């Protein structure tokens, strides 16, 4: 249990003991401890006096006074209590208890903020899963940054997380890829008789693949059409996936599993789920097609599984894939989808219900659109005209750290304008620069301290830490683990970036208010240890969103 929760629990226990001592209630109702919006109203507050009004049959202010009169303030670290308004009890704490977070952070190091106990739940987090038909763009970048950060957060919160990329290497888009490569392949050999398919891929990468295959495998031209397209499907996916994996690795995004859609066909899992759904009575035939009764499970309409030409819809392999996730022993399934996949939520949840799987185990986050902005104007993207702004170009333009930080600053369900000019600025207006500069500034101070013979572990007395800005800074450090817990619970990576900004801000305010290195050696030791705790917290928080913590800038 973190230090904040310990203090809250102690307050609850002491309030309960006080209620008993005052004889206000035989059965004590739930005691809620809140943080007042205005810090002038104390560190914590409770409305328990008003809750007890009917039970105790007394005025709430009288009840509040009785609680205060019987409270053991020392155990709860309380230095002052006010009764406000109709009966709110405001607690002002002796903030020396906060200094216990300093040696804890230093001792735990990279693990500070992480929950020690396992949640005992397996989470399969699927993200990015871009079709292997071209370069990654800004939408994929947001998905990658948020997904990877969320995986880090859930891991820190005690979940067993598997990071998975679903390779869409079957279906019409791969046939179109193969046809597009075929056209470019023969063009490279001087044969322009093969026209680009209507839904083909016109990017420069396809031209490059065609040229490369023409140089390395000219014999493919002599294959039968069926064998040739099969080879282009296979080689095309290999080329595209190698490039995607390389870009994602450079973007500091890594996966435990690369799950192939084709494997679902090879292992017979699609036929298996189809047979099972038929057996359970959830399918029917209409208009020459096979349908799934998803309306039985709150979907707005039934969905086609097999079209009237005998081909599968995208939905059928998606069902097989999600059922496979369940069979692998995952308790929670989290999908991060693009903005164009909103209609998939109800149908996927309904498909799991057909197998008796609680659909609440599937959580789907929709990544809203990102607009790339430069000099106040939107930079347009068009994947199929060859003019797309790729992830690689974004990394080259603003850097991995800035890209990842900016893309995790907002809730994924909100539209976001990515200001590339701001992301490149080396000023405190740039959020990632502001955060990293705080870390670098601390490292500089610690280096000076070491030159003076002061180590971060030298302090054993923190009573000299009394400055208001220092206390606020320590409160923020102590709030790191609760923030991770909250971010994990709400699946919200942006809570961590918000926390980083607040922590950096509190540090800069402290730095501007009080010198760390002074002639008072004991105070200096305490401050050096404190800013080391801040540095560790800042570094760990930045790592959670995949951003580095430079020691100098």
Swiss-Prot record:
MF term (GO), any: arginine-tRNA ligase activity
Disulfide-bonded cysteines: none
Keyword terms, alphabetized: Aminoacyl-tRNA synthetase, ATP-binding, Cytoplasm, Ligase, Nucleotide-binding, Protein biosynthesis
Lineage: superkingdom: Bacteria
EC number(s) given by UniProt: 6.1.1.19
Pfam families per the UniProt record, alphabetical: Arg_tRNA_synt_N, DALR_1, tRNA-synt_1d
One GO process term, biological-process aspect: arginyl-tRNA aminoacylation
Subcellular location: Cytoplasm
UniProt motif 'HIGH' region: location: 130-140
Family according to the record: Belongs to the class-I aminoacyl-tRNA synthetase family.
Protein name: Arginine--tRNA ligase
Originating organism: Staphylococcus aureus (strain NCTC 8325 / PS 47)
Lineage: Bacteria, Bacillati, Bacillota, Bacilli, Bacillales
Name of the gene encoding the protein in the UniProt record: argS
């Amino acid at each position: 249990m973190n230090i904040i929760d310990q203090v809250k629990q102690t307050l609850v226990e002491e309030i309960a003991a006080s209620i008993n001592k005052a004889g206000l209630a035989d059965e004590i109702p739930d005691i809620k401890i809140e943080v007042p919006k205005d810090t002038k109203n104390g560190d914590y507050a409770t409305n328990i006096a008003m809750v007890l009004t009917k039970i105790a049959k007394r005025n709430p202010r009288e009840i509040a006074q009785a609680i205060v009169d019987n409270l053991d303030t020392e155990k709860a670290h309380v230095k002052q209590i006010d009764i406000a308004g109709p009966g709110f009890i405001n607690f002002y704490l002796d903030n020396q208890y906060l200094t216990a977070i300093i040696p804890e952070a230093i001792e735990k190091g990279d693990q500070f903020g992480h929950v020690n106990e396992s949640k005992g739940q397996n989470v399969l987090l699927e993200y990015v899963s871009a079709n292997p038909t071209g370069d990654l763009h800004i939408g994929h970048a947001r998905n990658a940054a948020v997904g990877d950060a969320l995986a880090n957060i859930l891991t820190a919160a005690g979940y067993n997380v598997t990071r998975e990329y679903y390779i869409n290497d079957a279906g019409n888009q791969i046939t179109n890829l193969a046809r597009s490569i075929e056209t470019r392949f023969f063009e490279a050999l001087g044969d322009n008789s093969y026209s680009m398919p209507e839904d083909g891929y016109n990017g420069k990468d396809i031209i490059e693949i065609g040229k490369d295959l023409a140089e390395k495998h000219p014999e493919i031209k002599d294959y039968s059409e069926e064998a040739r397209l099969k080879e282009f499907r296979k080689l095309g996916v290999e080329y595209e996936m190698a490039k995607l994996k390389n870009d994602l690795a450079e973007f500091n995004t890594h996966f435990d599993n690369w799950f192939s859609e084709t494997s679902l066909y090879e292992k017979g899992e699609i036929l298996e789920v189809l047979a099972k759904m038929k057996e359970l009575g959830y399918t029917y035939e209409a208009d020459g097609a096979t349908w799934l009764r998803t309306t039985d499970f709150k979907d707005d309409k039934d969905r086609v599984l097999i079209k009237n030409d005998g081909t599968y819809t995208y939905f059928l392999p998606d069902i097989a894939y999600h059922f496979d996730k369940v069979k692998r022993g995952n308790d929670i399934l989290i999908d991060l989808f693009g903005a164009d996949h909103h209609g998939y939520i109800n149908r996927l949840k309904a498909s799991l219900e057909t197998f008796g799987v609680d659909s609440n185990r599937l959580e789907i986050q929709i990544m809203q659109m990102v607009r790339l902005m430069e000099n106040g104007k939107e930079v347009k993207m068009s994947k199929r005209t060859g003019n797309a702004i790729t992830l690689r170009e974004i990394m080259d333009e603003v850097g991995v750290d800035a890209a990842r930080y900016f893309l995790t600053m907002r809730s994924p369900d909100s539209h976001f304008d990515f200001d590339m000019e701001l992301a490149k600025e080396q000023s405190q207006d740039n959020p990632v620069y502001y955060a990293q500069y705080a870390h670098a500034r601390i490292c500089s101070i610690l280096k000076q301290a070491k030159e003076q013979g002061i180590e971060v572990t030298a302090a054993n007395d923190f009573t000299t830490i009394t400055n208001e800005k220092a206390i606020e800074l320590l409160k923020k450090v102590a709030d790191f683990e609760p923030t991770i817990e909250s971010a994990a619970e709400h699946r919200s990576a942006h809570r961590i970036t918000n926390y980083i900004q607040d922590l950096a801000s509190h540090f800069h305010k402290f730095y501007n208010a009080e010198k760390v290195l002074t002639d008072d050696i004991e105070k200096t030791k305490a401050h050096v240890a404190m800013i080391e705790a801040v540095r560790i917290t800042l570094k760990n928080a930045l790592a959670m969103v995949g951003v580095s913590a430079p020691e100098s800038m």
